[in-house]
Amino acid sequence: MNLKVGIIADRLNRVLTGVGTYVYHLVRELSKIEDISLITYQDPSLPFDVPTVIKNPFGVFSNHSLYLWHLYVNGALHRTTEFDIIHSPENAALITPVACKKVITIHDLILYLFPHYAGLIHRVRYRMLLPWTVKTADRIIAVSQSTKRDLVTRVGVPQHKITVIYPGVGPEFRPCNLNTIKEMREKYHLCNPFILYTGTLAPHKNVSTLVTSFKRLKDSGMPHSLVITGVKGWRYHSVFETIRRLHLEKDVVFPGYIPYEDLPSIYSAADLYVYPSLYEGFGLPVVEAMACGCPVVASNVSSLPEVVGDAGVLATPAVDELATSMQEVLSNEGLRGELSRKGLERASKFTWEKTAAETKKVYEELV
């Protein structure tokens, strides 16, 4: 049976962050399956392109009009009957009835559970659309058991409607050799040993707490820098205010957005990766770090214990607890080696091929 699947993929029209990475790799792996025909709704002129996929039959709006773009695509899908499945893999609502089965991937419920982490218009729109989205979907893919629990207990979605499918990590995420690491250090001017954080600068990512914990380490004589990469999100200014207040301008390094191809080398070069988030639906950067052999300290909240298992140190995402865990790992070479080995083994369980195969199974169950 040849399945015709339409995938709403406007995340490929922007800088790739966690959800965009999921969409990109899901589309790439599904496109390799012979009995699935894909059409994605994206801008084919941008770099995140999958050559074997038909793209963009309905046109593209600017990044500043993505909400209108969703309405436009929804209207177009309402009129078409060419698909067996329409899949929205990025929390986006399919708000009009369509003549085929609808699948949606829910990555997290951050704006539903913690509405103060977004602006008024965005959070009102999300809280209005999410209940309708999950009600009208034929199947919901949750990226973790934690996200599934949130959907069941907080939104009232029936358990039988939800399938948990973990995201993956690509084979490009592996420990890099010394020459590659040296080139990366020179490119981004990273001379000192360093602790790494990658991700959006947003309130729920708790980066200001990480900076304050790092200050405790500097006061104890640790030689490390703190390297913070990623895009500036909502209310990112608080991170820079914390750095100035603690006089850490020379110790906290912002190389900016790191291109995808450079991520493995920066993970490989770090002595420690820290993920202090207050809430995650999955936590893909943690798996990427483990896949590169970097020891991990992560928050003990939401999905992160599920993802990390015993392959990292889990800590309460507060200043003292994070500082203690970071100090413990950095001062114990044997522990770092153990976490590196366990992380490599743990990360190997998450592959995009597996994600795509399990997603295909969901499609087949619906038609």
Q: What is the role of each PLM region?
A:
Residues 1-367:
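Carbohydrate transferase catalytic cores enriched for Leloir-type hexosyltransferases
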